[in-house]
Amino acid sequence: MKIEEISKTSTFAWNNDPLPLLASGTVAGAVDADFSTSSSLEIWDIFSATNSKDPIFSASVDNRFYAIAWSKPSEGRSKGVLAGAFENGTIELWDVQELITSKDLQKASIFKSSAHSGPVKTLQFNPLQEHVLLSGGSNGQIFVWDTKKLSDPVAPGKAMTPMDEISCVSWNNSVSHIFATTGNSGYTSIWDLKSKREVLHLSYSANFSCVAWHPTQSTKLVTATGNDSDALILTWDLKNANAPEKIMRGHKKGILSLDWCKQDPEILISSGKDNATMLWNPIKGEKLGEYPTTANWAFHTRFAPAAPEIFATASFDGKIVIQSLQDTSPPMTSKVTTKNDNDFWNEISTTETQQPVFTVHQAPAWLKRTSSVSFGFGSKLVSISLDSDSHSVVKIQPFVKNGAVSETTSKFSQALKSNDFKDIIEARISDARHSKTDKADWEILSKLSGVGKEGFLKEIVSTEHEQANGKKPDVSSEDGTEPSRKEEGDNDFFEQLGESPIKSIPNFVPEGKFSIDTSDQSEADKTIIKLLLSNKIEDAISACLDQKKLSAALVLALDASPESKAKVRNAYFTNTKGDEIARLIYNASSKNITDIVANADVKSWKEIAAAIAAFSTDESDLSSKITELGDRIVQASENPSTEDRNNAMICYLAGNALEKIASIWLRELPEYEKSLLESPDDDVSTPSDAHFKSLNNFMEKLLAYRSITKANDTLGGPSIEPICNAILEYANLVAGYGQFELADSFLQLLPSDFAGLKTEKDRISRASGTKVQASNTRSTTSKATASRSYGKSPVPGASVPPTLPGNQTFAPAASTPYGGLAGQPAASSVLTPATPSFPSMPQPPQAPVSNRPPIASTPSIYGKPAPVGNPYAPQGATAFNPYKPPAPVAPEPVSAPPPAVSGPPKPAYRQETEGWNDLPDAFKQKTSTRRAAPAAVVSPSLSPALPANNFAPPKRNSAVAGPPPKGSRSSSRTAVPTIPTAASPSASTAQLHSRYAPPQSFNAPTEVSNGSGSPTPSVHAPPKNPYAPAATSSTNLPRNQYAPSVPTPSVQQPQTPKIGHASATPSGPSPNGPPKNPYAPTAQQVSMSPSGMVPPRTGSYGAAPSGVTAPPPPKVGGVLPPPGPVLTQPRSRNASAAAPVELTPPPTKPKYPAGDRSHIPEKSIQIYTSLDSLTQAVKPNVPERFIKHAEDMEKRLNFLYDHLNNDDLLSDDAIAELKKVCSAVEAKDYATATQLNVDFATNHSEQTGKWYPGLKRLISMAEATL
């Protein structure tokens, strides 16, 4: 079968590698189709993995070749020596290794000689002494060369019968000093170098053209005649040199080349003037077959020395054809199957119509076996032997080495079918050979199986809670079953975690007379009395706070405005900054325990878990928070103790964090294998046994956990590869023991596009004789999990790792057998507390939720007021708080009631494309980002709108405009110009540095214009949380700073900002503009999402519970702020527009073309030079499959250079921080560079854009490649 074809009219030589290289040189005496007289020497890698059609070395030479020879590797010549015989009588030697590496013909040249007086027609290296070279040419000249000495050659002696031309030389394969020559004299001479003379010569009726020695017998050789009238192949035994042993006929014209296979004496190949290449059995004297003919003389044919299955034939039709002895190509009839005449001729012209024809079928020696045995897939043993009649007998029988394996897999299979792992769990707990850690895992699984997740979580927190109430924990009922969550009497455990009923206190009624005489009061008290009597409550509160009368201020604030309440609240926390109770009050009053989960001492992890259970809004929220608690336990020390490990495992199991759990189990596999090998267990005698048993233990725990949590879907998520690798390996091992059905059940857990899955399924189906089932598993690249931190995956039993800022991807933290399994730092997250209820107006049903992308909320263009100071904010913090929710924007009045929210919106899932634009997981370790603690929440009020949610997608209602046009998924973000309001031009820096600052809000309207009352409000409770106490009153719930913004009654597409016009709305401007959110998609990004795709959720834990309706519109009124370049506010259709205010546009800076670097200012030039030089250093080292990532990285960095050149994006502070990043990268301090880069994104998010992912990728690639 044809393997390759080289379009060259060249002679050639193979090297001695198992996958051989081939050297070719333009043959002398041939006329090219273009009449070229040039000549070249080339080396080809026929079996290259890249399937390249180009030579690995090529160079022009002055003369053409008659022959080429390639020696075996020798001392100092790792790839041997290449010798060329030129038509001008020159012989030249080259070092092949030097040719390939340096590509320099002159540098690789070892020796060059013109000892021959005429053309050199043939040469060959001694097979037994690789440094000895034999050459022959015109004038009967024969020379022997020593490539070690590189001196003048020696002649073997005088011939008995002189020859005019030597056409072929051949060394004896058994005796190193014997060789044969043949030429135009009609004789074949046998020479002995020791005696330096011709010792024998053979003759026949026709002239000989070539000669070859028997591979193993020193006295036998074969010759061929070049006579066109009588082309013969003759075998000789020199013991009787008078006549040939065998005469073989088949060629129709003279034979030009012979080669006797070194590995099989019964195979000989020949080629000649009849354009044919034939295969012979010279021992039996019979023709075996014929290979496709060429279009001209086939002048040279040779087997590959170390790969005899391969041979090549060179012909004067300009081709070197590489073929295999065996032909496995389909028959001609199957290649051209069309019945149409025209199609037939079209196909036949491009189809290989010639095929080898074998008259005798004979296996080569290397394939012959009198008997053999082999292990078959599925624990089978196949043996082949010969019977008395020399017929092969094949036996296939099962082979079972370890009966314990069969028993183990059988029990595992039964547990899977019945979905009951209790027997396995009990057996593993009672097995004394298991380690304490492993037993602890099985005991936890047993407990989880007995009481379920809720009961399991009760047991975690019940001890601390019930001890505080003088009770003993009661996890299960008398019959051992888990009590229902809603038993009669409202005895649910989590309901009891709420506040106990407050002991009633009689209402205070003032009695008796009192004096308000201020004569004997202090000046401060006098001021307070006067303010109270003047009904100036707000001023009185401020005066009380100034006089440290906190109790009086608190009482006064009860009926004051939300701003006053917030001011008093912050004053309280400021005065009690170091008090732990105050810190807890802060978290409890805000109904947000993010601060507790993130910062409380993990030594009190059970108390933290109890708080998580009490305050979580839903199961997903609870899972994410308790998983984060597990991460903190693991990371509390560099070497976590067994107790810490078990405590973290409890949290992970309670939080459905399958990937976290599996990563711990997989990381412990090597240690478990080691303990098995050291144990006296009779079932474990080899490392292979230990590996299977440890992997089986992992699979049992994994499947038991999935059974307990009722997870029936396939595995999914961006970090499942280590688990999938382990499952695939175990399935392979189980199938190797013949358990095909069990192995296939494991494979059903894997995503359909997982690498190696299709091959393994096909192998199992073939071995079991069943058809491959159509995979119903989802693709890991076509279905994506929700984008959130440590939240519960849509797939039960699998958790999704944290969402990282920007384009940072997930990477393994340490090298393990399955990759990416070492302890990973917990990423920061922002949790979603319970959603408060609020009044709503009657609304018609909402239209069905569309699959189109929701319209992004337009940020306020009027700036934001100064927030109240935060007692817990760190000193020197930046003014920007990425986790602070934006202030609400008051909805505009509408002509008709807006549609009601009929149900929860569909969760937004991003469509994961395993994008080439994402940095691969294996490139870099993941680093956790610091996160801010939650902001305090102001007291509840029936405000017209809730705060916008920075971490949840805006909900879509039926009043929005049509879908946005398709476009790019990412756009460079630019800062939105803001105009400060009259109320907030002097916000202090200290006030802006708040991590825990309460969100800004509107006051509830106190009256309605024209005396028309608003519709009767209906109070809706938030979705029921099975883990939190029931709310006593919906009006007392605090506002939720992380809840999603309520849809406005009418939303229109944001308009393009126009210079000289200010937007106007009937309701007046919003005094509180939302802060910039660096992690939410810009309006442009959302509007340009492809149609039919929902943009990714950006909330840490997804949207807050639905079931709420929009609040009534606020009172119309207010004064427009100073005009400026603004974005058109969304407004209702019947909103009246204010007259535009003309503005003088600011002077524009010159814009330089993309790619120009000549105008980069001095302050920024360091950034450009540093990053550009680093890019050029990284690019050559990037693996081929990541080239696209590198190209995208460079493209994005060019966006940064363009911004630097135009000086139009980065502030001086941002440039200074970027310089620090560059300095850290230059110093190869990649950890510092990464942290500085994250800080840059946090502090200057509005100045990032298309270029920022390029910088992140550059740092990662530099760390991985330099």
Curated annotation (Swiss-Prot):
Main location group: membrane
Any single Gene Ontology cellular-component annotation: endoplasmic reticulum membrane
Record field: compositional bias (Polar residues): 826-838, 1000-1017, 1031-1043
Annotated InterPro entries: SEC31-like, WD40/YVTN_repeat-like_dom_sf, WD40_repeat_dom_sf, WD40_rpt
Organism for this UniProt entry: Meyerozyma guilliermondii (strain ATCC 6260 / CBS 566 / DSM 6381 / JCM 1539 / NBRC 10279 / NRRL Y-324) (Yeast)
Protein name per its UniProtKB record: Protein transport protein SEC31
Comp. bias regions, Pro residues: 883-907, 1068-1078, 1110-1125
Residue spans of biased composition, Low complexity class: 774-789, 930-948, 968-990, 1044-1057
UniProt GO molecular function: structural molecule activity
Family affiliation: Belongs to the WD repeat SEC31 family.
SMART domains: WD40
Origin superkingdom: Eukaryota
Membrane topology: Peripheral membrane protein
One Pfam family here: WD40
Keyword presence, Iron-sulfur: no
Alphabetic keyword roster: Cytoplasmic vesicle, Endoplasmic reticulum, ER-Golgi transport, Membrane, Protein transport, Repeat, Transport, WD repeat
Ranges where the record places region Disordered: 463-492, 760-1157
WD repeat placement: 5-45, 60-104, 115-155, 161-201, 203-246, 250-290, 293-333, 374-397
Biological process according to GO: COPII-coated vesicle cargo loading; endoplasmic reticulum organization; positive regulation of ER to Golgi vesicle-mediated transport; positive regulation of protein exit from endoplasmic reticulum; protein transport
Location of this chain's protein in the cell: Cytoplasmic vesicle, COPII-coated vesicle membrane; Endoplasmic reticulum membrane
Function: Component of the coat protein complex II (COPII) which promotes the formation of transport vesicles from the endoplasmic reticulum (ER). The coat has two main functions, the physical deformation of the endoplasmic reticulum membrane into vesicles and the selection of cargo molecules.
Compositional bias per record (Basic and acidic residues), positions renumbered to this chain: 463-475
